[in-house]
Amino acid sequence: MDYIIAGLGNPGERYTFTRHNAGFLAIDYLAQAFNTKVDKIKFKGLTGSFEYADKKVLLLKPMTYMNSSGDSIVEAVNFYKVKPEKLIVIYDDIAFDVGVVKMRKKGSDGGHNGVKSIIQRLGTEEFPRIRIGIGVPKEDMVKYVLSEFEDYEKQKIFRAIEKAAQGIKILLESGIDRAMNYINGDVVV
């Protein structure tokens, strides 16, 4: 495997369309875009793979629940001997309005427990991530991130996921700097 793309979320139907599952929704979109299925049970998660631009890519949805995402991801990284800079993690971010997408090469967990778990298990912050804005909570944070998107927000989220997927294509074709220029170039509204 050349790349691992992991989307963060919580398993189970009741969480499918919740804000905290933006990463899972992105992986589902990527699977469809690259004509694969994320249905093989491996690495404490669901996986699928595809080839694009002469790169082999593993899609991963950890089934460990958010706060233990690192347990699943580190297994895949170690099995395929993928360097952290070839691990792309997609997740929700309450720091951005709904539909904003941002990419960076490395950084702290920003208060996100799933990312915190990955950093702890990998022993490094040096992995790229794509953050999908889910809005700033006006209420209890746990209740907010586990709530479903409002109808008026759904189009913004799916456009953000489309933009993230296009960024992944650009990354595989032309590298991370081009992908970051595309993703960070403007705000999706």
Swiss-Prot record:
<keyword id="KW-0694">RNA-binding</keyword>
<feature type="binding site">
    <location>
        <position position="67"/>
    </location>
    <ligand>
        <name>tRNA</name>
    </ligand>
</feature>
<dbReference type="GO" id="GO:0005737">
    <property type="term" value="C:cytoplasm"/>
</dbReference>
<dbReference type="GO" id="GO:0004045">
    <property type="term" value="F:peptidyl-tRNA hydrolase activity"/>
</dbReference>
<dbReference type="GO" id="GO:0072344">
    <property type="term" value="P:rescue of stalled ribosome"/>
</dbReference>
<dbReference type="InterPro" id="IPR001328">
    <property type="entry name" value="Pept_tRNA_hydro"/>
</dbReference>
<feature type="binding site">
    <location>
        <position position="113"/>
    </location>
    <ligand>
        <name>tRNA</name>
    </ligand>
</feature>
<dbReference type="Pfam" id="PF01195">
    <property type="entry name" value="Pept_tRNA_hydro"/>
</dbReference>
<dbReference type="GO" id="GO:0000049">
    <property type="term" value="F:tRNA binding"/>
</dbReference>
<comment type="function">
    <text>Hydrolyzes ribosome-free peptidyl-tRNAs (with 1 or more amino acids incorporated), which drop off the ribosome during protein synthesis, or as a result of ribosome stalling.</text>
</comment>
<dbReference type="GO" id="GO:0006515">
    <property type="term" value="P:protein quality control for misfolded or incompletely synthesized proteins"/>
</dbReference>
<feature type="binding site">
    <location>
        <position position="15"/>
    </location>
    <ligand>
        <name>tRNA</name>
    </ligand>
</feature>
<feature type="site" description="Stabilizes the basic form of H active site to accept a proton">
    <location>
        <position position="92"/>
    </location>
</feature>
<protein>
    <recommendedName>
        <fullName>Peptidyl-tRNA hydrolase</fullName>
        <ecNumber>3.1.1.29</ecNumber>
    </recommendedName>
</protein>
<keyword id="KW-0963">Cytoplasm</keyword>
<keyword id="KW-0820">tRNA-binding</keyword>
<feature type="active site" description="Proton acceptor">
    <location>
        <position position="20"/>
    </location>
</feature>
<comment type="subunit">
    <text>Monomer.</text>
</comment>
<keyword id="KW-0378">Hydrolase</keyword>
<comment type="function">
    <text>Catalyzes the release of premature peptidyl moieties from peptidyl-tRNA molecules trapped in stalled 50S ribosomal subunits, and thus maintains levels of free tRNAs and 50S ribosomes.</text>
</comment>
<feature type="site" description="Discriminates between blocked and unblocked aminoacyl-tRNA">
    <location>
        <position position="10"/>
    </location>
</feature>
<feature type="binding site">
    <location>
        <position position="65"/>
    </location>
    <ligand>
        <name>tRNA</name>
    </ligand>
</feature>
<dbReference type="InterPro" id="IPR018171">
    <property type="entry name" value="Pept_tRNA_hydro_CS"/>
</dbReference>
<comment type="similarity">
    <text>Belongs to the PTH family.</text>
</comment>
<dbReference type="InterPro" id="IPR036416">
    <property type="entry name" value="Pept_tRNA_hydro_sf"/>
</dbReference>
